[in-house]
Amino acid sequence: MVIVYLAIACGFGALVRYFFSRYNQASKLPLGTLIANLLGCFLIGVFYNHVESKEVYAILATGFCGGLTTFSTLNDELQRLLSDKKVFYSYLILTYLGGLVAIFLGILL
């Protein structure tokens, strides 16, 4: 039954990511994907420290956060930003450093 809940949670995470991706499409920086990825990292940190059940953790972290965050879209957006090095490196640093900080902040809560 965990697999069913995990799949449902993943679908919800993907829907949330979709709505974030619609945000600020005119910006050079893909803010929707950045917000989705940073939120997913933060939530994984929160779940890591506050969810005792391995099954519930799998549903929330792997399911919901897995659907919310996106490595493939991130890399697609990065390759599109290669022509503007400043934006490319800003997005790269914000995503990876921000994700690491977000996980630690979630754990500290």
From Swiss-Prot:
Coiled-coil regions, chain positions: none
Catalyzed reaction equations: fluoride(in) = fluoride(out)
Top-level taxon of the source organism: Bacteria
Subcellular localization, as worded in the UniProt entry: Cell membrane
GO molecular function, one term: fluoride channel activity
Regulation: Na(+) is not transported, but it plays an essential structural role and its presence is essential for fluoride channel function.
GO cellular component, one term: plasma membrane
Membrane topology value: Multi-pass membrane protein
Record's keyword terms, sorted: Cell membrane, Ion channel, Ion transport, Membrane, Metal-binding, Sodium, Transmembrane, Transmembrane helix, Transport
Disulfide-linked positions: none
One GO-annotated biological process of the protein: cellular detoxification of fluoride
Pfam families cross-referenced by the UniProt entry: CRCB (PF02537)
InterPro entries, A to Z: FluC (IPR003691)
Main location, first listed in the record: membrane
Ranges that cross the membrane: 1-21, 29-49, 55-75, 87-107
Chain sites annotated for binding Na(+): 66, 69
Role: Fluoride-specific ion channel. Important for reducing fluoride concentration in the cell, thus reducing its toxicity.
Family, similarity comment: Belongs to the fluoride channel Fluc/FEX (TC 1.A.43) family.
NCBIfam families per record: PRK14229.1
Name of the molecule in the record: Fluoride-specific ion channel FluC 1
Origin species: Streptococcus pneumoniae (strain ATCC BAA-255 / R6)
